[in-house]
Design a protein with these regions (language model features):
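Short, solvent-exposed recognition patches
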Residues: 1-104
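Surface-exposed amphipathic alpha-helical segments
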Residues: 105-128
Length: 128
């Protein structure tokens, strides 16, 4: 369950988005949604058949996050100044899938995809 210090946000800050996109990836405009309080961006690479999603949302009072711990290994990592949780699992082809979640300044963030770990971190650090 998330805790919010002070008043919870009513909307994401103006211009809040992911600002780093790895070479060869394009946003899937059909799958994206953007609202005042949250967004979901989906990216894929036709060359490598890799994909990832970026989701940010203001924290709602009483909001919870659920984690699959049967097929995923979790560790704590730093995302800028924030503590994040990195989940590592494998897809049906044996390729690593990463799920990085953290909260910062009243906003929950998740970057998930079957792309290299260092790209997951660059994407995460480019959200502002």
């Amino acid at each position: 369950t998330y805790q919010v210090d002070g008043e919870p946000l009513e909307r994401l800050p103006d211009g809040y988005s992911d600002h780093y996109v790895p070479d060869g990836f394009e946003m899937d405009n059909a799958q994206k949604f953007e609202r005042a309080e949250n967004f979901l961006h989906v990216y894929s690479s036709k060359e490598t058949e890799e994909s990832y999603t970026v989701r940010c949302s203001i924290i709602q009072p009483g909001q919870q996050s659920l984690f699959d711990n049967e097929h995923t290994v979790y560790e704590t990592v730093k995302v800028g100044e924030a503590d994040g949780v990195l989940g590592t699992s494998t897809d049906e082809h044996g390729k690593n899938v990463y799920t990085l979640s953290w909260e910062h300044r009243g906003i929950t963030h998740t970057v998930m995809g079957n792309i290299p770990y260092d790209e997951i971190m660059k994407i995460a650090e480019g959200i502002r």
